């Protein structure tokens, strides 16, 4: 049995061809932080006949099952990435939409200190930093918030 079949079963989902194909696409490095529409277009490019409504439904099921994480970066469009074992935060360019993942133990420690200061037991958090590419290589894009990875 393939790892993807087992992952779906472990999440309590029936193994179906659309779920397997969508999971395969999400595992491609360039398909992290991808919208439902972008995922649908990628499936079409691969010759898969999976409808947009099915893509939305499967992504919602994956989100509920913890297979993917849904992000709402500036611009309002949901993007998805496979859930990972390691925590990371995101830096997002407001002009071109590039998403950079990073981890910083100093930031993590400070967040734990703040939670303790306010007598809150921290269970989870998300940190999104927004800015603009400063190195002159930003490819301003009318479809900002499309991830480049």
Curated annotation (Swiss-Prot):
InterPro entries: FUR, Fur_C, WH-like_DNA-bd_sf, WH_DNA-bd_sf. GO terms for cellular component: cytosol. Its main location: cytoplasm. Keywords: Cytoplasm, DNA-binding, Iron, Metal-binding, Repressor, Transcription, Transcription regulation, Zinc. The keyword Cell inner membrane does not apply. Zn(2+) binds at residues 33, 81, 90, 93, 96, 101. Gene3D superfamilies: 3.30.1490.190, Winged helix-like DNA-binding domain superfamily/Winged helix DNA-binding domain. It comes from the Bacteria. Changing residue 104 to G: In strain: 775met9. Belongs to the Fur family. NCBIfam families: PRK09462.1. Homodimer. This is Ferric uptake regulation protein. It comes from Vibrio anguillarum (strain ATCC 68554 / 775) (Listonella anguillarum). The gene is fur.
């Amino acid at each position: 049995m393939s790892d993807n079949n087992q992952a779906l079963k472990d999440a309590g989902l029936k193994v179906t061809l659309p779920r397997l194909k969508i999971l395969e696409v999400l595992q491609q490095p360039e398909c992290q932080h991808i919208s439902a529409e972008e995922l649908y277009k990628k499936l079409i490019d691969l010759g898969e006949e999976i409808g947009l409504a099915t893509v939305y439904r499967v992504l919602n099921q994956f989100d509920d099952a913890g297979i993917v994480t849904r992000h709402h970066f500036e611009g309002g469009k949901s993007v998805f990435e496979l859930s990972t074992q390691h925590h990371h935060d995101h830096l997002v360019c407001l002009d071109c939409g590039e998403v950079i993942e990073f981890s910083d133990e100093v930031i993590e420690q400070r967040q734990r200190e703040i939670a303790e200061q306010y007598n809150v037991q921290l269970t989870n958090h998300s940190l999104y930093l927004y800015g603009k590419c400063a190195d002159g290589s930003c490819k301003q894009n009318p479809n900002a918030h499309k991830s480049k990875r």
